[in-house]
């Protein structure tokens, strides 16, 4: 058995460790110290520590890189909350509903622990910590207000070099000029030496137009703009197209965003403290 290192050392998963504690705890005690030196309290404390560690769905964060997320709000009751530093930048007088937390929480989940529910996302890069700024509600937002917030956020968090922005307009960009939102995003990236990863925007529900152009700020030239594909690599049914100014190819890349009518075709996310949810969209391809 490749899990046995020598006559007294072997590798076990948490469930096997718990089973060993229950059925043959003296074997572990002999391997640690003289059994006569262990009190009943020592055994109970060690068992409680082991149970707590086995029950963790995710390890504690350490010195992992930090990604900035600018989105709707973040639900601090989710299992990975330790990995996310959250700041609500909306006026405290603005009432928030449960829906206002779902989109932003799902986006940060993908960055922190996406491969947990989506094995296709496992790229060997590990987990990332997130600094999450809530700038919008689920009901919509003023793009100019958000852009002003983004400039202040980036200026105040110079240690973060990569930012995720999964917010965008339902309207199409104009064929002959870059949107004011994208132009400002380009300026911010140039001034502060950062890069934004921007969702390529979705075709809104109920719209039947084919070849719908992307919405701002997905026409940002300096940003990495991400469209979505299904798990077979086909372009998702809700994706929109470029180019920008007739010759800048946008979106730049595509990644898994989920698509289809059954839950197995969608992305698994944690958007609240109620368990897994199934979603699709460029918002979840970008992170």
Role assignments for model-derived ranges:
Residues 1-58:
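Autoinhibitory propeptides
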Residues 22-26, 187-190, 215-220, 245:
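Short, surface-exposed basic-aromatic patches at helix termini and helix-loop junctions that form
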Residues 36-69, 234-248:
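Long, acidic, intrinsically disordered low-complexity segments
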Residues 56-87, 94-143, 193, 220-222, ...:
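Subtilisin-like serine protease catalytic core
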Residues 71-73, 79, 213-287:
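Extracellular S/T/G-rich loop segment that most often corresponds to the catalytic His/Ser-adjacent loop
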Residues 73-75, 138, 169-171, 202-205, ...:
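Solvent-exposed loop/turn segments at secondary-structure junctions
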Residues 93-105, 276-287:
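Gly/Ser-rich catalytic serine loop of serine hydrolases
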Residues 136-216, 276-280, 284:
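Substrate-binding/access-modulating region of protease and related hydrolase catalytic domains
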């Amino acid at each position: 058995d490749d899990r046995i290192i020598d006559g007294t050392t072997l590798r076990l998963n948490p469930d096997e460790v718990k089973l060993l504690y229950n059925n043959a705890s003296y074997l572990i005690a002999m391997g640690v110290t003289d059994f006569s030196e262990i009190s009943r309290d020592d055994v109970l404390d060690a068992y409680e520590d082991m149970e707590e560690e086995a029950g963790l769905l995710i390890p504690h964060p350490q010195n992992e890189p930090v990604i900035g997320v600018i989105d709707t709000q973040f639900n601090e009751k989710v299992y990975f909350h330790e990995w996310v530093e959250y700041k609500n930048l909306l006026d405290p007088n603005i009432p928030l509903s449960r829906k206002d937390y779902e989109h932003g929480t799902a986006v940060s989940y993908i960055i922190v622990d996406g491969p947990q529910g989506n094995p296709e996302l496992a790229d060997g890069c590990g987990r990332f910590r997130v600094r999450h700024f809530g700038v919008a509600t689920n009901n919509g937002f003023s793009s100019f207000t958000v852009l002003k917030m983004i400039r202040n956020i980036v200026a105040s968090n110079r240690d973060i070099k990569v930012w995720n922005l999964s917010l965008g307009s339902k309207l199409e960009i104009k064929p002959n000029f870059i949107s004011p939102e994208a132009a400002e995003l380009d300026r911010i990236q140039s001034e502060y030496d950062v890069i934004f990863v921007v969702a390529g925007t979705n075709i809104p529900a109920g719209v039947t137009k084919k070849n719908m152009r992307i919405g701002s700020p997905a026409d940002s030239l300096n940003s990495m703009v991400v469209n979505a594909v299904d798990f077979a690599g086909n372009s998702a049914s809700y994706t929109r197209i470029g180019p920008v100014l007739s010759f800048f190819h946008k979106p730049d890349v595509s990644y898994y965003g989920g698509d289809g009518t059954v839950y197995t075709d969608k992305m698994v996310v944690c958007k609240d403290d109620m368990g897994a949810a199934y979603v699709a969209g460029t918002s979840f391809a970008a992170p």
